[in-house]
């Protein structure tokens, strides 16, 4: 059932389907409204908060007060008194706890009662952004005697740890919500952990909407400072039309929007994509001279399929669609460029249209696309052509003049250290994690590996011998790996008191029902080193930083303390442990979906909305699974999910070290960046990843398992990128965009042709160490846009794609009981380059000479 709430909660209407709710909203011309999906089951109405009701549900949510100044204990007491009277009548019990400016509330009752009450709560103007922390069935009431008794934090305890911890976790959780994929957000609103959900097959219409020639905009030095504004405009236009037509934004990928609709909204999908083009045309006509928004055009491909909606990855996660139809949609979008049309869609999409719309379309023929054996039949709407070459010429000839945009991009290196956004995770070299392929140890990554140093902009190589002694506070949460007795807690306190006093560290450790929440105060270096030791402690796992920032004066006394919540505070307010445990659990889950730069900026006590758009030079990395379509076309959805999760986790384990960051997870493709002065480290990560794939194949060599056929190629390219925060309509994206983003995908693609698993371009080769540059790379017969490319030398890094393909065919044949086809050995092309062609010095390669470029075959 779906509930539509409008007029600030005064009007509520229920519907059986989402279509009915959307149609009513459109027909009634309702602008500001909220829609909720609920499950209703027959239930006996509760009465008076008694514990005799059946089919009960418990819902916990977090919200932020719109007027925290008036929320004193007296105000909350009166609000709770009124709520108690009203909620007793409908049989709802629970509690309300307030810690400025956040409210934590639990309500218990039947499905029907909670759905009605929560709809009104969500529309209450006294608070905003109601985020569900838990929502599920319960066998009885935990708070039947409380009804809606309030508890202002000042009434519960004066202990500073509780106030600080609740505020820091709630603030970070609330701020990260807008970066969460909508599909994952919907799961959390239903009280479910997205990472724990099994893959769900869906029949959907998928689209890739391209911002035409966005790479040319990025390549034009006169337009670099407007790139963030162009992207933000594109995000807002896509969000408005996609979500306004009943669709869902899957992700944004450097000037590309991936979205999907249920199949019963196919016509709305095509109309929304056309409206995006019309909106951009209107924006172009309204721009002042010199605005790059006047160069924005869209081009899209649409396809129907049955992918699965699932969580991909664990340390770095994405809740998205996976399936062969996603790749086909991307190929159709590429065909739109050839036909000079703003919208191209497949025969499968045409079959979902009604006769009226079918009469409007025209056929565009049958075409072969990459990764698909059968050709695709495509259609388009008649109308004006969209000439991509014309758009490129306009961009190349464009001059902004004196125009000044609202979101100017600044050079990262030109900013003072204190103003630089934390785009790199600057982990101290002395504390590097051991390199282990695959999943590594049991400890999870803390926002992609030990981020506390960069969070507070701790000292780098220029630190003096005594270290940075600036007073700093750090709060983290973790889960105990085993039950902790009073003796265990006493032992922890004795050890911590002795060691921390020597380092001038004060603070508190709170233990709540298996959850550790610790705050440390002291010199920056001492706090950071202690935190890194804590992460290796086998008594706890899932260690996650909540807050780290400079401190004016110490909050805690000189004697370090440990507080057991069950002993003191919970005796006054028992629900407190539920709030802390659930909030910490939800925060840990949410943090893996949010860009690492945003998390570091947020946990340093900053507003992520204030992240400054910057441009800088980085080494870009792109990798994906070889012959992924062939491998998965005859595999089950569960196997596809398993392959992607295994590969993505291996990528994050190899990549997320030494300042490298994962940018996007796109099906089986992973993109990342590394500091421009750390090319050797990027190559080492690529070697680790390819080694993992080889070891994985060896582990399943005698088993009919798809993991026995997993291999990958890795491309590395250097170039300038723009890093900026985009979007203002409820969905926020932190993007890393540049012409290098497209080139690195081409570099990765030629690994299949040249026989090397790792290929780097000349700008990357120039940044390698002398040893690796002169003795570890080999010229390849391919080039990208005139740039010579080089493979990483060594037999262990050769890529035999034909062997991989034969293995995939043999696997599918063995599973189906068929005899695999054999190919004559003479017919097998060999793209491998002899390992003996190792480059020495600069012979055979000249960085900038025309002669050197002409000697390489250009793709």
Curated annotation (Swiss-Prot):
Signal peptide (UniProt feature, chain positions): none
Please give an example of a GO cellular component term from this record: motile cilium
Q: Does the keyword Repeat apply?
A: yes
What molecular function does GO assign, one term? blue light photoreceptor activity
| Similarity-based family | Belongs to the adenylyl cyclase class-4/guanylyl cyclase family.
- Keywords in UniProt for this one? Cell projection, Cilium, Flagellum, Repeat
Q: What is this protein called?
A: Photoactivated adenylate cyclase subunit beta-like protein FB
Q: Which organism is it from?
A: Euglena gracilis
Q: Does the keyword Thylakoid apply?
A: no
Question: Where is this chain compositionally biased, Polar residues type?
Answer: 846-859
């Amino acid at each position: 059932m779906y509930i539509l709430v409008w007029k600030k909660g005064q009007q509520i209407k229920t519907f059986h389907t989402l279509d009915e709710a959307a149609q009513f909203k459109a027909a009634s011309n309702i602008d500001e409204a909220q829609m909720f999906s609920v499950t209703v089951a027959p239930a006996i109405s509760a009465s008076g908060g008694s514990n005799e009701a059946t089919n009960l549900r418990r819902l916990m949510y977090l919200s932020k007060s719109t007027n925290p100044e008036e929320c004193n204990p007296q105000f909350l007491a009166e609000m709770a008194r009124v709520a108690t009277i009203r909620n007793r009548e409908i049989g709802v019990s629970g509690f309300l706890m307030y810690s400025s400016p956040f409210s934590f509330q639990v309500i218990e009752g039947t499905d029907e009662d909670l759905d009605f009450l929560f709809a009104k709560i969500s529309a209450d103007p006294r608070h905003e952004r109601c985020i569900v922390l838990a929502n599920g069935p319960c066998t009885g009431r935990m708070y039947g005697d409380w009804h809606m008794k309030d508890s202002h934090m000042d009434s519960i305890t004066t202990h500073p740890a509780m106030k600080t911890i609740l505020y820091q976790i709630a603030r970070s959780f609330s701020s990260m919500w807008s970066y969460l994929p909508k599909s994952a957000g919907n799961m959390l609103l239903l009280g479910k952990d997205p990472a724990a959900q099994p893959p769900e097959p869906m029949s959907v219409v998928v689209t890739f909407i391209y911002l035409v020639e966005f790479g040319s905009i990025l390549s034009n030095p006169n337009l670099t400072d407007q790139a963030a504004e162009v992207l933000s405009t594109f995000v807002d236009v896509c969000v408005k039309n996609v979500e306004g037509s009943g669709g869902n934004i899957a992700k944004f990928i450097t000037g590309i929007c991936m979205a999907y609709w249920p199949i019963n909204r196919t016509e709305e999908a095509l109309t929304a994509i056309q409206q995006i083009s019309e909106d951009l045309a209107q924006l172009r006509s309204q721009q002042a001279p010199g605005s790059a928004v006047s160069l924005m055009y869209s081009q899209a491909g649409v396809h129907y399929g049955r992918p699965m909606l699932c969580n991909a990855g664990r340390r770095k996660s994405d809740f998205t669609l996976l399936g062969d139809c996603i790749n086909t949609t991307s190929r159709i979008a590429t065909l739109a460029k050839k036909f000079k049309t703003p919208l191209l869609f497949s025969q499968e999409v045409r079959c979902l249209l009604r006769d009226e719309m079918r009469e409007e379309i025209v056929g565009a023929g049958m075409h072969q696309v990459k990764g698909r054996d059968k050709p695709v039949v495509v259609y388009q709407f008649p109308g004006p052509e969209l000439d991509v070459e014309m758009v490129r010429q306009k961009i190349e000839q464009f001059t902004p003049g004196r125009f000044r945009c609202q979101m100017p991009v600044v050079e990262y290196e030109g900013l003072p250290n204190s103003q630089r956004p934390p785009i790199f995770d600057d982990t101290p070299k002395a504390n590097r994690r051991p390199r282990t392929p695959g999943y590594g140890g049991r400890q999870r990554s803390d926002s992609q590996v030990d981020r506390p140093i960069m969070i507070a902009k701790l000292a780098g190589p220029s630190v003096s011998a005594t270290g940075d002694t600036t007073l700093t506070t750090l709060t983290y949460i973790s889960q105990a790996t085993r039950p902790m007795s009073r003796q265990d807690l006493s032992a922890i306190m004795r050890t911590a008191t002795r060691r921390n006093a020597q380092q001038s560290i004060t603070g508190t450790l709170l233990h709540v029902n298996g959850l550790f929440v610790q705050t440390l105060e002291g010199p920056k270096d001492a706090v950071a080193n202690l935190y890194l030791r804590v992460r290796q402690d086998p008594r706890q796992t899932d260690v996650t930083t909540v807050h780290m920032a400079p401190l004016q004066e110490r909050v805690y006394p000189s004697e370090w303390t440990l507080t057991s919540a069950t002993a003191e505070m919970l005796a006054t307010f028992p629900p407190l442990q539920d709030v802390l445990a659930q909030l910490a659990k939800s925060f840990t889950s949410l943090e893996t979906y949010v860009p690492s730069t945003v998390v570091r900026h947020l946990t340093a006590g900053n507003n992520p909305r204030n992240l400054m758009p910057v441009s800088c030079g980085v080494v870009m990395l792109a990798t994906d699974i070889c012959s992924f379509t062939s491998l998965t076309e005859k595999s089950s959805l569960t196997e596809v999910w398993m392959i992607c999760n295994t590969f993505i986790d291996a990528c994050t384990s190899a990549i997320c070290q030494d300042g490298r960051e994962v940018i996007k997870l796109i099906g089986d493709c992973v993109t990342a960046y590394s500091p421009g002065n750390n090319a050797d480290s990027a190559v080492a990560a690529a070697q680790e990843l390819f080694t993992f794939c080889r070891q994985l194949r060896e582990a399943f060599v005698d088993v009919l398992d798809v993991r026995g056929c997993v291999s990958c190629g890795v491309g590395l390219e250097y170039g300038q990128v723009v890093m900026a925060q985009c979007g203002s309509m409820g969905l926020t994206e932190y993007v890393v965009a540049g012409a290098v983003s497209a080139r690195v995908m081409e570099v990765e693609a030629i690994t299949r042709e040249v026989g090397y698993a790792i290929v780097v371009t000349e700008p990357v080769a120039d940044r390698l160490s002398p040893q690796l540059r002169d003795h570890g790379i080999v010229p390849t017969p391919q080039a990208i846009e005139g740039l010579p490319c080089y493979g990483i030398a060594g037999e262990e890094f050769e890529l035999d794609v034909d062997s991989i393909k034969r293995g995939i065919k043999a696997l599918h044949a063995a599973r189906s009981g068929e005899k695999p086809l054999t190919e004559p050995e003479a017919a097998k092309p060999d793209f491998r380059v002899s390992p003996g062609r190792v480059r020495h010095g600069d012979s055979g390669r000249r960085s900038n000479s025309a002669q050197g470029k002409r000697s390489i075959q250009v793709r």
